[in-house]
Amino acid sequence: MAPLGLKAVVGEKILSGVIRSVKKDGEWKVLIMDHPSMRILSSCCKMSDILAEGITIVEDINKRREPIPSLEAIYLLSPTEKSVQALIADFQGTPTFTYKAAHIFFTDTCPEPLFSELGRSRLAKAVKTLKEIHLAFLPYEAQVFSLDAPHSTYNLYCPFRAGERGRQLDALAQQIATLCATLQEYPSIRYRKGPEDTAQLAHAVLAKLNAFKADTPSLGEGPEKTRSQLLIMDRAADPVSPLLHELTFQAMAYDLLDIEQDTYRYETTGLSESREKAVLLDEDDDLWVELRHMHIADVSKKVTELLKTFCESKRLTTDKANIKDLSHILKKMPQYQKELNKYSTHLHLADDCMKHFKGSVEKLCSVEQDLAMGSDAEGEKIKDAMKLIVPVLLDASVPPYDKIRVLLLYILLRNGVSEENLAKLIQHANVQSYSSLIRNLEQLGGTVTNSAGSGTSSRLERRERMEPTYQLSRWSPVIKDVMEDVVEDRLDRKLWPFVSDPAPVPSSQAAVSARFGHWHKNKAGVEARAGPRLIVYIVGGVAMSEMRAAYEVTRATEGKWEVLIGSSHILTPTRFLDDLKTLDQKLEGVALP
């Protein structure tokens, strides 16, 4: 399946703006990357695409490499001290350098001291190209981006890192600006009024975008483009969404199963012995794209239907399209192994999710939904939330993190509880060793303890939703309401103010990136989108239910708007609680901005 949306834009920018820009017929080149640039490349390009463009080998700059002095090298690197030193080292050897010449592409602006060091080194003689391509983010999905900076939550919210806050916000702003520039957007910027972070980040992004606009005056031009918006929200505006057990396929699988680096592992029972299979859950799999936002109750039904249709189209007979049946079909028709394996993977995945759900999760879901909504499935207001949660807290079979999720939802519903009540709840749940994790929600801006006992909830006003939903999936993320209000032009300007636009940057500053004289403008051949975009950035991580909302709102506008969403990193409930756990700890080894 060809890359979609954001992945296609970034893939094309790398192929056209980097590799093809220095390609010569009949000449092979070496491609050298560091870890961050390798993550960007592998998120949107296949190795076969790269090799088809005259690249003979792809190498890691931090690993030992055999010199190939007969070939020129393309370096795609993040502008860090470590990568720049490794680059300089490639051109220090005698009598020959590691490579014949260097075409250097930095993913972002190279700091002046490193730039000067490059100029003073022997490398300067071998440089044929030097560009900054401003691509400091990962296209995670067609409409989802990640800044690949999970450490930023700690740097922003841990009191021990208070001195790093400004630098961290500045680094995130630069990355967000490269996303807008890559999409050829110069959006109006809005933020949630209240928290300092959102306002500070919004102003910093505008300053960075103005520098890009000075360099590329056509940025954001087009009749519909003036309506594009960048919206910055903090995690405290919706701490509920990352806590809930979601029952849509992608969110449920990532919450309940052990999916590492988007890879699902499972045992297959073959003809003779069972073996482990590892499958990447990404947009190359069109079946995954079709199923990922469906409710689990519909997934198995849909896979079975699709499998039946496939079998009928190939004149295969099957009564019950299930996992066992699939292995028999495979025996008969090995030529369809690729397609049948895909169905098998998703049947396994759905089956796996349901096994976990039928264990302890099912009984938690209705409690969580009632607490999140503040009302039960019939719409009756919850009068005694304590009665709901005590059975869960006292149940020894419920894992600590699941108890904490329920506990935090209760605290959020009550807008904080008294110190005395909190201590009792923690004791009932037997989660004393996690008490600081629970209290750390305050570092994000949530209310955990309330001296008056219990406050009234200070939540954003929610939309009344009339569409039918499953009883255990009544909650919809706050950001979905906000997205809908933006595309309908009804978002409250007092609660979500625009950043006032300072005077345009004088053109004398525009040459900041043209330091090496042979700078080339990036003219990647991706067709720019004509309609407006809404780009949402959530400070502190984005939940998978929020990712789903971006696709749902885009679909509801029938393509008039494209909604993109992202953050420093993608959250699962476990990841969210792990992040909270660190916010009162003095940790060594967390990356500085």
Curated annotation (Swiss-Prot):
Family to which this protein belongs: Belongs to the STXBP/unc-18/SEC1 family.
Task: Recall the GO molecular function terms of this protein's record.
Answer: syntaxin binding; syntaxin-1 binding; syntaxin-3 binding
**Taxonomy of the source species:** Eukaryota, Metazoa, Chordata, Craniata, Vertebrata
Q: Which InterPro entries match?
A: Sec-1-like_dom1, Sec-1-like_dom3a, Sec1-like, Sec1-like_dom2, Sec1-like_sf
The Gene Ontology biological process terms listed for this entry are: cellular response to type II interferon; exocytosis; leukocyte mediated cytotoxicity; neutrophil degranulation; protein transport
Q: What is this protein called?
A: Syntaxin-binding protein 2
Q: How does it assemble?
A: Interacts with STX1A, STX2 and STX3. Interacts with STX11.
Highest taxon, organism lineage: Eukaryota
